[in-house]
Regions:
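Acidic metal-phosphate-binding loop of nucleotide-sugar-dependent transferases
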Residues: 76, 101-103
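Conserved donor-nucleotide/metal-binding helix-loop-beta segment in metal-dependent transferases, i.e.
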Residues: 84, 89, 105-133
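Acidic helix N-cap motif at the loop->helix transition within catalytic regions
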Residues: 55-64
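Active-site oxyanion/phosphate-handling segment shared across diverse enzymes
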Residues: 143-170
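Short aromatic/hydrophobic "clamp" motif used to bind/position activated sugar donors
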Residues: 94-95
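Glycine-rich, basic loop-to-helix element that forms the pyrophosphate-binding segment
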Residues: 59, 77-85
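Conserved donor nucleotide-binding strand/loop of the catalytic core
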Residues: 64-76, 87
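N-terminal glycine-rich phosphate-binding loop and ensuing alpha1 helix
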Residues: 2-50
């Protein structure tokens, strides 16, 4: 089972444009996050999923420098962007992370993935985000590629398509 962390990133944030590449202690915030994700033992590959807007060319350049896979797709249909990123990177299990959380804990990532792999609950989704059980910024969502493909095929909600996982929780 290929476990791929898909990091959702874009430069056109409405509240703080460019925040994912803003420097924190002389390093881009996304660089700090990638370092922490790389410490997670359960993650086999990391891919940054960004938009096909030209403003996100900076993220593609950053991914190249960081030696991280990149997928570019629709700005608004983030669900489809995740699906294509998973397909192109051979993901069986997807760990969804957002690029504006540089303090993500690798042990929490490993814990969520290990629960998912146990399948003792018969679930295709494991999360500490719904209901929130950890502080904001430590959110980890883990789901099967099959669940992602079903959500992408079945939902027509623009909200679901923009926010990736709401379909899972209904």
């Amino acid at each position: 089972m290929n476990v791929v962390a898909v990091v959702q990133a874009r430069m056109a944030s409405t509240r703080l444009p460019g925040k994912v590449l803003l420097k924190v202690i002389d390093r881009p915030m996304l660089s700090i996050q990638l370092e922490r994700i790389r410490q997670a033992r359960q993650i086999e590959k990391i891919v940054i999923a960004t938009t096909d807007n030209s403003v996100d060319d900076q993220i593609e350049e950053f991914a190249y420098i960081e030696n991280v896979a990149i997928y570019r797709g629709s700005e608004n249909d983030v669900l489809h962007r995740f699906k294509r990123a998973a397909e192109q990177n051979g993901a069986d299990i997807i760990v969804r992370l957002t690029a504006d959380c540089p303090l993500i804990d690798p042990e929490i990532i490993d814990y969520i993935v290990s629960i998912f792999k146990q399948k003792s609950y018969g679930c295709n989704v494991v999360s500490n985000a719904v209901p929130r059980s950890y502080p904001a910024g430590l959110d980890v969502e883990c789901f099967s590629r099959q669940a992602l493909e079903i959500a992408c095929a079945e939902t027509t909600s623009l909200y679901d398509r923009e926010h990736v996982t709401p379909y899972f929780y209904r």
